[in-house]
Amino acid sequence: MKVILLTEVKKLGKKGDVVEVAEGYGRNYLIAKGLAVEATEGKLKELQQQKEAANRRKEKELQEARSLAEKLKNIELVLYGKGGENGKLFGAITSKDIAEALEKNYQIKIDKRKLDLKENIKALGVYTVEVKLHPEVTAKLKVAVKEEGRG
């Protein structure tokens, strides 16, 4: 009998897979425990539509990420900090500061966890920060840190 798995089942498959199983195993275990449903024509059609919708959604997310990467490529974000001697900052610029400045200045909302800042910025200068927008899309954002009052 053919069943559609509703959750991952060890040694059988993952959610959404259509698998052939013994009649008793399918009815008495998989379907009874809610791990699968019988693969009727209607259920197979529904599964296909769900997969197509998921693919469209993933493609849309990828396109949006690529578009955002293009925008970020052309931005030089300027942040100001209180400077000390030798170009050092009092305090540091964090990924949270960068995310907030992007939203405030460019209306681009990015989760601070997507900013790949190896360590907080503690000196004046220009830095390149990687932004992980999507598993397949990474953008580079220029961040210039200048001393307050000097511009």
UniProtKB/Swiss-Prot annotation:
Domain of life where this protein originates: Bacteria
Record keywords, A-Z: Ribonucleoprotein, Ribosomal protein, RNA-binding, rRNA-binding
GO biological process entries: translation
Pfam entry (one): Ribosomal_L9_N
Ribonucleoprotein found in the keyword field: yes
Signal sequence region: none
A GO cellular component entry from the record: ribonucleoprotein complex
InterPro entries associated with the record: Ribosomal_bL9, Ribosomal_bL9/RNase_H1_N, Ribosomal_bL9_bac/chp, Ribosomal_bL9_C, Ribosomal_bL9_C_sf, Ribosomal_bL9_N, Ribosomal_bL9_N_sf
The keyword Protein biosynthesis is assigned to this record: no
Gene Ontology molecular function, alphabetical: rRNA binding; structural constituent of ribosome
Family, similarity comment: Belongs to the bacterial ribosomal protein bL9 family.
PANTHER family associated with the record: 50S RIBOSOMAL PROTEIN L9
Entry function: Binds to the 23S rRNA.
Protein name in UniProt: Large ribosomal subunit protein bL9
Organism: Carboxydothermus hydrogenoformans (strain ATCC BAA-161 / DSM 6008 / Z-2901)
Name of the gene this protein is made from: rplI
